[in-house]
Amino acid sequence: MERHFEKVEEILKKYGYKRENLIKILLEIQEIYRYLPEDVINYVSTAMGIPPAKIYGVATFYAQFSLKPKGKYTIMVCDGTACHMAGSPEVLKAIEEETGLTPGNVTEDLMFSLDQVGCLGACALAPVMVINGEVYGNLTADKVKEILRKIKEKERESANV
């Protein structure tokens, strides 16, 4: 697939092609693509005069960057001790049953991606998952499936508008 770089170029211009703005630049690029594609990293490297290895170093050091496509809805399931004991394995199983996803993967339609993470800091609500920054706690398999079905329904409705 041939990619056009107009939006990337706008971001680079906005930040003056300055090295000290690399993290901001990468964050904005990731908002567009939902990850940092290799060809875009190479484009940024050439445009900014930064070796690709340096950009990959930044992209792999900071947890908020992804080199793999992410879904429109990024699901993070806590598997810290409290959540694990309270049922996070069942939460993961319910997500897999509803979406076909296993941790570290994305659905073919790029609707959902799933990450299994350490403590999310909401132990009192265990088991917990976060979808695009929204925390869902005290989960059961049925609650998880209901949440995901509502998201799917919302997406179907907005596609039909």
Curated annotation (Swiss-Prot):
The gene is hydC. It comes from the Bacteria. InterPro entries: NADP_DH_HndA-like, NuoE-like, NuoE_dom, NuoE_N, Thioredoxin-like_sf. It catalyses: 2 H2 + 2 oxidized [2Fe-2S]-[ferredoxin] + NAD(+) = 2 reduced [2Fe-2S]-[ferredoxin] + NADH + 3 H(+). This is Bifurcating [FeFe] hydrogenase gamma subunit. GO terms for molecular function: 2 iron, 2 sulfur cluster binding; metal ion binding; oxidoreductase activity. The lineage of its organism: Bacteria, Thermotogati, Thermotogota, Thermotogae, Thermotogales. It is found in: Cytoplasm. Heterotrimer composed of HydA (alpha subunit), HydB (beta subunit) and HydC (gamma subunit). Near neutral and acidic pH conditions favor oligomerization of the heterotrimeric holoenzyme. Changing V128 to D/G/R/S/T/W: Increase (about 23-33 mV) in the redox potential. Keywords: 2Fe-2S, Cytoplasm, Iron, Iron-sulfur, Metal-binding, NAD, Oxidoreductase. Gene3D superfamilies: Glutaredoxin, NADH-quinone oxidoreductase subunit E. It is an enzyme of class 1 (oxidoreductase). Binds 1 [2Fe-2S] cluster. [2Fe-2S] cluster binds at C78, C83, C119, C123. It holds the Pfam family 2Fe-2S_thioredx. Belongs to the complex I 24 kDa subunit family. Its cofactor is [2Fe-2S] cluster.
